[in-house]
Amino acid sequence: MKVLVVNAGSSSIKYQVVDMTDESVLAVGLVDRVGIPGTTLDHSPLGKDKVTIKKDLPDHTAGMELVLQVLVNEEYGCIKSMDEIGAVGHRVVHGGEGFAESVVIDDEVKRVIKECFEIAPLHNPPNMMGIEACQRLMPNVKHVAVFDTAFHQTMGPANFMYALPYDVYEKFRVRRYGFHGTSHFYVAHRAAEMLGKPYEECKIITLHLGNGASMAAIKDGKVIDTSMGFTPLEGLVMGTRSGDIDPAIVFFLMDKLGMNSSEANNYFNKKSGMLGLSGVSNDLRDILEAAGSGNERAKIALDVYYNKVKGYIGNYIAKLNGVDCLVFTAGVGENAIDIRENVCANLDYLGIKMDVEKNKVRGKEVDVATADSKVRIFLIPTNEELVIARDTFNLAK
């Protein structure tokens, strides 16, 4: 079976075609600027040159129509007909409390996804547009939803509840949900394989460090805690998100800067984090370069970043009662040598010792701990699309 993996954003559609006989990727692509003048489709078929098509597309249905045309194109397609696609897997950011695993999409599933529009307004609506576009164009195959929140649904109330009046949980389901679950799931399972232990017997801390960043503590095959919360704003310092702050700062700055709630939401999600602290960029590569040139704000931003990650490592080791491995993944985690080194510095007392020479790699699956480190330190490139393809295949076959 061949599976089409779709990740629909507000103005983009990312896709892959995966042949499940050997899990090979037959094509990857991106439709960018959907509904905006200047739409482009970049399509990279296996063993062929990348193709770029420029064509304005009014909506996600038009975008998916173009994707399907490209997939069967005689010159640069990867399949002969759409009959070869046995199922479609959709990334959905928020499944609320309703889903602890991936599911075949039906009317009830779509109702729950729509219920979560209010708590995931930037992600769930375009995810749903992608689902409905694909269902219109491919009505005879199974469509599967794979939720970013699902992996974290094993958390207990001690870690998912906030100390707010209990009725806000009962009425509005205000609680910690966590995100990046598909990535945490993939690298945690790979880490167990690298440890040579059953996954259900491991204590693992996963660090998904990208422009958005989150960590998870996994024990006996279950997430017990994760750093993102009710929304992806909570937790680590990120590219443009503040992460953990005193909630009173929100009200103070709304008053001082004359912001309404929407403007405040934008302020803490889009103007804060490493961008706000450094004044340089949201990109850690730029901030590292600026710090190396003597920029004091960039240095402070990096110190705040390292401090926050270290704090979560200590927190999670306490909750796990020890740890077998740390796992670095995502754009920063896989590629930023200096970031990894500084995060792991001075953690010897916890049994975490990095080999700085082994650490000088990017994008490879490797153990960078010293031989005598009690805790292994793994770099594992994430593969969310493969998880989506596998779940889709298993539910559709």
From Swiss-Prot:
<dbReference type="GO" id="GO:0006083">
    <property type="term" value="P:acetate metabolic process"/>
</dbReference>
<dbReference type="GO" id="GO:0006085">
    <property type="term" value="P:acetyl-CoA biosynthetic process"/>
</dbReference>
<feature type="binding site">
    <location>
        <position position="14"/>
    </location>
    <ligand>
        <name>ATP</name>
    </ligand>
</feature>
<dbReference type="InterPro" id="IPR000890">
    <property type="entry name" value="Aliphatic_acid_kin_short-chain"/>
</dbReference>
<feature type="binding site">
    <location>
        <position position="384"/>
    </location>
    <ligand>
        <name>Mg(2+)</name>
    </ligand>
</feature>
<protein>
    <recommendedName>
        <fullName>Acetate kinase</fullName>
        <ecNumber>2.7.2.1</ecNumber>
    </recommendedName>
</protein>
<keyword id="KW-0963">Cytoplasm</keyword>
<keyword id="KW-0547">Nucleotide-binding</keyword>
<comment type="subunit">
    <text>Homodimer.</text>
</comment>
<feature type="binding site">
    <location>
        <begin position="283"/>
        <end position="285"/>
    </location>
    <ligand>
        <name>ATP</name>
    </ligand>
</feature>
<feature type="binding site">
    <location>
        <begin position="208"/>
        <end position="212"/>
    </location>
    <ligand>
        <name>ATP</name>
    </ligand>
</feature>
<feature type="site" description="Transition state stabilizer">
    <location>
        <position position="180"/>
    </location>
</feature>
<dbReference type="GO" id="GO:0005737">
    <property type="term" value="C:cytoplasm"/>
</dbReference>
<dbReference type="GO" id="GO:0000287">
    <property type="term" value="F:magnesium ion binding"/>
</dbReference>
<dbReference type="Pfam" id="PF00871">
    <property type="entry name" value="Acetate_kinase"/>
</dbReference>
<comment type="function">
    <text>Catalyzes the formation of acetyl phosphate from acetate and ATP. Can also catalyze the reverse reaction.</text>
</comment>
<keyword id="KW-0479">Metal-binding</keyword>
<keyword id="KW-0460">Magnesium</keyword>
<dbReference type="InterPro" id="IPR004372">
    <property type="entry name" value="Ac/propionate_kinase"/>
</dbReference>
<keyword id="KW-0067">ATP-binding</keyword>
<keyword id="KW-0808">Transferase</keyword>
<dbReference type="InterPro" id="IPR043129">
    <property type="entry name" value="ATPase_NBD"/>
</dbReference>
<feature type="binding site">
    <location>
        <position position="91"/>
    </location>
    <ligand>
        <name>substrate</name>
    </ligand>
</feature>
<dbReference type="InterPro" id="IPR023865">
    <property type="entry name" value="Aliphatic_acid_kinase_CS"/>
</dbReference>
<feature type="binding site">
    <location>
        <position position="7"/>
    </location>
    <ligand>
        <name>Mg(2+)</name>
    </ligand>
</feature>
<feature type="site" description="Transition state stabilizer">
    <location>
        <position position="241"/>
    </location>
</feature>
<feature type="active site" description="Proton donor/acceptor">
    <location>
        <position position="148"/>
    </location>
</feature>
<keyword id="KW-0418">Kinase</keyword>
<comment type="similarity">
    <text>Belongs to the acetokinase family.</text>
</comment>
<comment type="pathway">
    <text>Metabolic intermediate biosynthesis; acetyl-CoA biosynthesis; acetyl-CoA from acetate: step 1/2.</text>
</comment>
<dbReference type="GO" id="GO:0005524">
    <property type="term" value="F:ATP binding"/>
</dbReference>
<feature type="binding site">
    <location>
        <begin position="331"/>
        <end position="335"/>
    </location>
    <ligand>
        <name>ATP</name>
    </ligand>
</feature>
<dbReference type="GO" id="GO:0008776">
    <property type="term" value="F:acetate kinase activity"/>
</dbReference>
